[in-house]
Amino acid sequence: MKVLVVGSGGREHAIVTSVAKSPRVDKIYCAPGNAGIAALAECVPIGAMEFDKLVAFAKEQAIDFTIVGMDDPLVGGIVDVFEAEGLKVFGPRKNAAILEGSKAFSKDLMKKYHIPTAAYENFTSAEEALAYLETAKMPIVLKADGLALGKGVLICNTLEEAKAGVKEIMEDKKFGTAGNTMVVEEFMTGREVSVLSFVDGKTIKIMSSAQDHKRAKDGDQGLNTGGMGNFSPSPFYTKEVDDFCQKYIYQATVDAMAAEGRPFTGVIFFGLMLTEDGPKVLEYNARFGDPEAQVVLPRMKNDIIDVMEACVDGRLDTIDLQFKDNAAVCVVLASDGYPVSYEKGFKISGLEKFDGKDDYFCFHAGTKFDDNGDIVTNGGRVLGITATGADLKEARKKAYEAAEWVDFANKYMRHDIGKAIDEAK
């Protein structure tokens, strides 16, 4: 069969890597792809938001199955456009992708269906938000309602910071129309854990847990980013936590969406906070995380096409989802200055060292070919260096070793990815 993957990041490289392992797949295309994906798939110069061009390409090439990795096209309704043309596509429809596309929607859904989450209020007026904050308990969390590249969340320790945050989100429109509505949420403390799942509209199957590192600098300092590294599984995601989430969160979310007439098909990413009062939902994403996909997919035993097709066909209950009893750690190599300003176009050396190594993966995010055919940096997050091992400590050691194999002029990484592994009992 012929498969088209839509997107261009490390997550899409991880998806393409899994698809390439399927004996059912003869040909992979990726739009627009990147320099790493090009080793496994034919990259097509069509942007992820160019729905008409993507549909025309899928028809022209007789694509059997399309996988959408990114949030923007999903929230924008790419699945509806493909389905209307009779094309098979993996991902939620527009009316279900709102689970990620609007934080206000997802908070209201959780409240209505009693899914554990932080107390909150939604605001469409900056004045009302400011009045509410005058009497609110600090610290407090402000969230832009819409998509903001994972950066639309502000944690405010004082009233002054909160007022500045309202100005930034609602008045200065730092995140554009994503800030037309704003969620104000109680600040929760605990450990953050990500859990990825496959969903077919009614059945949900949990993949594995992972733990992200959002801040740009060591010691969780600096600005929020799309993610600087990751490990899977999380040692803090215990059987007790899983039992609670299975009972009160996972199926409850799928059932809530179905009850609202918005059946969800695709991947639901649960961002959880493990609080003293039990697990609570921080956020939902309507797709694989990045770099969560890079640590979870290499551990999956199943043929990814079998699982994704079962989701689309509504027969996920027939799939026995299995993961290796191992661990993975991903360290992101970024351009120095990310997530604010950074130079790009630097030549990357050492990529060939990953060839033929089973336990090591170099997932490309911000890379491209220059005019000479050399692979150069082309973004803030450049590569996701991932290693698997028998346990988290071994995987971490291997990932940091492999991070030294590659070099480019403004290479930057965190040196404490997975430090929480040492804190686990």
Give, region by region, the residue ranges found by the protein language model.
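ATP-binding N-terminal substructure of ATP-dependent carboxylate-amine bond-forming enzymes
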Residues: 1-94
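Active-site nucleotide/adenylate-binding loops and adjacent lid/helix of ATP-dependent enzymes
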Residues: 4-5, 100-182, 211, 235, ...
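Solvent-exposed alpha-helices and their adjacent loops that cap or buttress functional pockets
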Residues: 20-21, 36-38, 60, 90, ...
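Short, conserved charged micro-motifs
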Residues: 53, 129, 161-164, 339-342, ...
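Internal nucleotide-binding/catalytic subdomain
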Residues: 156-293
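Active-site "cap" helix and flanking loop/linker of ATP-utilizing ligase/carboxylase catalytic domains
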Residues: 245-268, 285-357, 370
